[in-house]
Amino acid sequence: MKVDLNCDLGEAFGNYSFGGDNQIIPLITSANIACGFHAGDQHVMNDTIKLAKDNGIGIGAHPGLPDLQGFGRRNMDLSPEEVYDIVVYQLGALNGFCRIHDVKINHVKPHGALYQMGARDKVIAHAIAKAVYDFDPTLIYVGLSNTLLISEAQALGLSTASEVFADRRYEDDGQLVSRKEADALITNTDEAIKQVINMVKFQKVITKNNNTIDIKADTICVHGDGAHAIEFVTQIREQLTKEGISITRLGG
């Protein structure tokens, strides 16, 4: 049994610093690198790719909506054509820096509101997946487990990785509880680790309404920007290892 640990990185831009990329990157196996629309800029993208390469982890594109002020977490009324174009644009930007470092993009994971829109809207999900497929059909597509993100990508023939979240609560339909709700995040480390093991080992998760639903876990999203993020991810790694679960990069 194996699983990937992924984290969103490269979210600083200009004079704005964000996250602890240098501290978290030795603990993960895949990096989702912001491509300049919701966060990141050309210098940060360049530096983050080099950091990921030096640590031997999978490099992923993390395209988001063009909304720096809202960190890409606010929905936008976009046509499928607009969604397609913003995804291709960001993949091209990241790929340019990958080429100068002689590395390849390994996977793609939509960010924030784009991710949530795709999980719920078949047309948007198809537009995102089609952009990825047309750019490079060999890329691994990361999406929320058991949602349209995964099914639309698979329908096009993309390899997919079903994603679960260590520190997020779930609705009964498998969607994530909205960040607008007070109980959306799991702040207790023991509870989060228990949820991770349950999802990876038994393919189950307990929802916010205390119901048990099926879930597929190919990759676990962890975050590097919390007060206890490093300790949290370290404990997750240790517990996965104790359970006999190998931590391996996507496609590895």
UniProtKB/Swiss-Prot annotation:
Enzyme class: hydrolase
EC number(s) given by UniProt: 3.5.2.9
Keyword Thylakoid listed: no
Substrates-to-products reaction catalysed: 5-oxo-L-proline + ATP + 2 H2O = L-glutamate + ADP + phosphate + H(+)
UniProtKB keywords: ATP-binding, Hydrolase, Nucleotide-binding
Domain of life: Bacteria
InterPro entries documented for this protein: Glyco_hydro/deAcase_b/a-brl, LamB/YcsF/PxpA-like
Gene3D superfamilies for the chain: Glycoside hydrolase/deacetylase
Quaternary structure, from the entry: Forms a complex composed of PxpA, PxpB and PxpC.
Record-stated family: Belongs to the LamB/PxpA family.
Function: Catalyzes the cleavage of 5-oxoproline to form L-glutamate coupled to the hydrolysis of ATP to ADP and inorganic phosphate.
Name under which the protein is recorded: 5-oxoprolinase subunit A
Organism for this UniProt entry: Staphylococcus saprophyticus subsp. saprophyticus (strain ATCC 15305 / DSM 20229 / NCIMB 8711 / NCTC 7292 / S-41)
Source lineage: Bacteria, Bacillati, Bacillota, Bacilli, Bacillales
